[in-house]
Structures are given as C-alpha cells and as structure tokens.
C-alpha cells in the first residue's frame, strides 16, 4: 500500500464513518439504546475499526495486506450495505394498532424465578459435565486450535454455557437498581472467567457480560459516553491480555505492539477478511441457503444421526477450507457481508441488508414491548430475552447470517423450553398446594397495559 493509495482509502473511510456515526448518534440521542444503535456500533467495530490498525501494521511493520482495490471494494460494499439496512429499518411496514392485542402469555413471581433458575441450571450443569470430561483445558492444551480436536469431548455443550447470562439478566430486571447492576457484572464475569479456564481460552462470555453491563448502564443513565469510551479501552486491553494467555505468547517491546495490533484487529474487526474473500471471488461456488441448514447440524446428536458430518460446511468453514485452502484448524470469519457473498454473490448483499433491517426492527419492537409492559415479571422476561440475544447480534455482524440463524433459533428454543417448564412446574406446585394463594392474587393484580400486550 502506497501513501497515495492510503490517502484514497482514507477519504472513503472518513466519509463512511461520518455517515454511519451521524445516523447512530442521532438515534442514540433519541432513545439512548435500542438494537439499531447496538447493531450500528457492532457494524462500525467490525468493518471500520480495523482500518487504522491495518494501516499501522503496513507502514510501521511492513505487513503485506490484501491488494488495495479489494480493500476499497470491501469498504464500499460495507457502506452500501449499511445504507440499505438503515432505509429498511426506518421504513414503517404497517400502521400502529388501535385495538389491544390478546396477550400470548403472562407471568407471575414464581414462574419468573423458576425461569431464571432453570436457565442458570442449564449453564452450570453443562459446565460441570464439560469439566468432568475434560478438566481445565487452559492448562492442558498447548494450542488453542486443539479445542476443536477429537481429544476434547462434549464440545457441543459450550453452546449452553451462555444461558447463565440471560438468567442473571432476569435477576437484574426484577430489581433494576445499582446493586443488582453490579451483581450482574460480578456474577457473569466470574462465570465467564470460569468458562475461560475450563474451555481453554473462549472469551465470548466475558466480552458479552461486560458489554451488557455497559449497555444497561447507558439505558439507566449510570454511564456517560466518556465512561463508555474508557471502558472500551479497558476492554480492548483486557481482551488482548486474555488472547496472549490463550495462545501462550510472551512478547515485549516492538513485538508486543505488533502483536497487539494484529490480535486486536482480528478479534474486533476482521474487515480484511471481506477484502480477501472478494479477491478470491472467482473461486467461490455460491452455496445458496445451504450453509444456514448445515449450521444446524451441530445441534443434532450423533446418536440420532450416526452419519452426521464431523465438520460443518457453513460459510466460515467454506471460506477457510475451499476458498483459501487453509486447514490450520481455526475457521476464518467471513463477516456478515462475506457470508452473503458466499451464499449468493454480490447480489445477495442488498437482499441481506433488507433481511437484517427487518431482523433488527423485530428485536426493537419486542424490546419496546418489554419496556412498556406493566406486569414487571413479564417485562423482566421480555427484556432479558432481548438483552440475552445481544450475543446473537454480535455473531450476525462478525460471523455471518448463517451462524446467526442457527444460534438465534437455538437460543429461542432453550429459552422457550425453560419458560414452558417453569410454567409446568408452577402448575404442579400449585396443584400440590405449595403455592400461597395470597401471593398469586397480588401478582395477578398487575395486568398488562392493553395497548402494549403481546
């Protein structure tokens, strides 16, 4: 990359960042937090945060990067995608209802407490089973990629660990004070550190717990933008330190700065992967919607499907194995736009932007229903579900649409199963005479707002 090429890229970069930041800041001033603001921040992080890091790697350390024209295509496609997404998100599809909706379900105190207990048991129970099978992998494995090898059993259990976070979200939303806020941070980060040590370097639970703590603080007005920026810097440094421990790296001086740049870029902003994918566009055999279906394979037990493929060919694995011919053991993220390109080429980019706009619009509708709900137990469940889905939104921006669909369906199934089981247990306890009727009557006095019922 020459200085002239850098100047041209920087102009496009500046226009794109100002465009997205302006729209995001206007939305932030209007509502403080919603899923459009969240997705926009994640989108900026994924596709634009890495550009300065890439430039420092190129000019400070002489690192070879994707040809500039493909980086330009990546930046332009990301900007066009966001424009189409934003128009879709802001388009009103129907007029507001004048008639009240019939509520799909209601909640009381016992059912709500049973729900978060069941969610926590799912997480703690699967962590315990994984630990009994593998021990502390952080101290046993000499390479992070071996987490996905046949030496590690029960890998599918890792998907259940995350449900500790929505469990603690229910606890927070029942109280919604500073004490509950800090309890959420302490409990979820402690659980995240435990899973980091047991699994051998998976940082997702720690990142999500800290991010949700900040988002809640923004919503409640307990955190300012300056505090958020400082927390972001702390989070980046913390994730870098955890990455060093995960990969067993011992660096200092210029090497430490170089390692910080490329690990931070790869962790938070794999935007160069999109340029790399576009560079190899002629090698892609468009997969259609098959990667979405294939990503569900991991949820099917081998006992039910003995011929189930051990390796799932989703868009990330297709990009890594078939396009790049990379078989190092770790999948290279194609990003949201890259996953659309793998599925249907550049024509899928505007279609994907429309789909994503509708997805974020639905999450915001559900979140608003939760905030407006007068039954505080039902409100806690709805808001916990929405905030608990933040991890899926991160997966959407960073990993792709296929990974998002499988994970959000899995999240809905497990969350819904715990909710239904909680109601069933409540019915059994009530039938057995274990429920105090006075408490039930007082809870039923809190009826949902007729204009905001689900």
UniProtKB/Swiss-Prot annotation:
Keywords: Cell inner membrane, Cell membrane, Membrane, Transmembrane, Transmembrane helix
Transmembrane annotation, as ranges: 3-23, 39-59, 61-81, 119-139, 154-174, 180-200, 201-221, 222-242, 340-360, 377-397, 409-429
Annotated pathway: Bacterial outer membrane biogenesis; enterobacterial common antigen biosynthesis
Pfam hit, one: WzyE
InterPro entries for the chain: WzyE
Location within or outside the cell: Cell inner membrane
Single biological process term from Gene Ontology: enterobacterial common antigen biosynthetic process
Gene Ontology cellular component terms for the protein in this record: plasma membrane
Highest taxon in the source lineage: Bacteria
Membrane topology value: Multi-pass membrane protein
Chief localisation class: membrane
Biological function: Probably involved in the polymerization of enterobacterial common antigen (ECA) trisaccharide repeat units.
HAMAP family: WzyE
Assembly and interaction partners: Probably part of a complex composed of WzxE, WzyE and WzzE.
NCBIfam families xref list: PRK02975.1
Similarity comment: Belongs to the WzyE family.
Name assigned to this protein: Probable ECA polymerase
Record organism: Yersinia pestis
Gene: wzyE
